[in-house]
Amino acid sequence: MLHITNSLTRTKEEFVPLSPGRVRMYVCGMTVYDLCHLGHARVFVVFDMVTRWLRASGYAVEYVRNITDIDDKIIKRAHENKETPAALTERFIAEMHEDERALGVLPPDHEPRATAYVAQMLALIAQLVDRGLAYAAPNADVYYSVRGFPAYGRLSGKSLDELRAGERVEVDPNKRDPMDFVLWKAAKPGEPAWESPWGQGRPGWHIECSAMSAELLGQHFDIHGGGQDLQFPHHENEIAQSEGAHGCTFVNYWLHNGFVRVDNEKMSKSLGNFFTIREVLQKYDAEIVRFFILRAHYRSPLNYSDAHLDDARGALTRLYTALKGAPAAGPVDWDAPAAARFRGAMDDDFNTPEAIAVLFELAAEANRGDTGAAQTLRNLGAVIGLLQRDASDFLQAGTSEAGLDASEIEARIAARQAARKARDFAESDRIRDELAAAGIVLEDGPGGTTWRRQ
């Protein structure tokens, strides 16, 4: 039975979907004005893993992950680039999809763009105004009145007074309370704008997700996820908007993945330790990056460093080494002891570190000649989107530390075999040592010599 740590209650709870056998899940996606970074990679991979596990558990999952394609940052970047916001966002949506494919992330069932749902946002804002939970300000912005929603702060675990004291909120004469947040922004010259009952303008960020999730999943659904940085204010504000407008529970289970840190420091452009997915993939195979993300529990901080990625590469290499000659993945026999342990780990709040430990147990058995263990390793890896390549393809991918590609390595192996045939063992050993220094491991067997990268 699956148990999930619910950020709303701060406890681990048994997962019971609203409709038996069906799960509806919404995850906050990208604001598309730049290339995706490591924090985005973690969101992509974590909720891909969650979706895969729910489906492996027999649920029909409807997974929605939105795209924010209108935002202050988008408008600013488009102006700097002398292009339209639409052209900018279209380009970075394509780049995002390329990154996801590289990381083995399955596409969501729905990927709504905010600009396609402005009518729904306007209807939701009108409901909030009618209920006395929102007001038009003198500057033609529309704000949510947090005083009107007594449960505000429930997700954060803080009262409104505590939130006011803890947040550095600029005094705005248009707001009735410093914590009030914008639902509709009045139009500014040169910015995209839509007609509304309050004049031309565009939606605020928070209302976008409330409107899109209600339109695609209904007013009350099972799981809402995203990065820990969105818990406040974004997700807190979503609850206030959605429950304030609809008068019912918004979401049953809130899931938040932990922060990504770089060498134990917060990742930021100002510190010069900010990495895009593209930059990381220039140094490391994409499956290594996915494996690195899944080795950590999704709620824990993830500390990025070259040393940790190198360690992940070595660990994944050990798993693939055990898969030499293994056939493609097939159905999992969940009654098998290893598979049952894997299920137990995943059902315990998606505990991927424990699940991956089971994979290493299977690899050890496979290395002792247990072909059934190798097949189970392959099958269980598939459940979380790992270990599906031909083992030799993974083990020989890329270039060596000395810059050797596969054809150059094969040529040196052929030269070594010629030296051995001529009984020139000194030359044979020299070539082996040279390749070892370049990070290439040779394995001599009855069928000849095979190789892999360390």
Swiss-Prot record:
Alphabetically ordered keywords of this record: Aminoacyl-tRNA synthetase, ATP-binding, Cytoplasm, Ligase, Metal-binding, Nucleotide-binding, Protein biosynthesis, Zinc
EC number: 6.1.1.16
Sequence motif: 'HIGH' region, positions: 30-40
Known catalytic reactions: tRNA(Cys) + L-cysteine + ATP = L-cysteinyl-tRNA(Cys) + AMP + diphosphate
InterPro entries (UniProt xref): Cys-tRNA-ligase, Cys-tRNA-synt_Ia_DALR, Cys-tRNA/MSH_ligase, CysS_C, Rossmann-like_a/b/a_fold, tRNA-synt_1_cat_dom, tRNAsynth_Ia_anticodon-bd
A Pfam family: CysS_C
Example GO molecular function: cysteine-tRNA ligase activity
Protein location: Cytoplasm
Ranges spanned by the short sequence motif 'KMSKS' region, renumbered to the chain: 266-270
Single Gene Ontology BP annotation: cysteinyl-tRNA aminoacylation
GO cellular component, one term: cytosol
Gene3D superfamilies: Cysteine-tRNA ligase, C-terminal anti-codon recognition domain, HUPs
Binding site residues for ATP: K269
Family statement drawn from the similarity comment of this UniProt entry: Belongs to the class-I aminoacyl-tRNA synthetase family.
Quaternary structure note: Monomer.
NCBIfam families assigned to the protein according to its UniProt record, in alphabetical order: cysS (TIGR00435)
The name this protein goes by in its record: Cysteine--tRNA ligase
Name of the coding gene: cysS
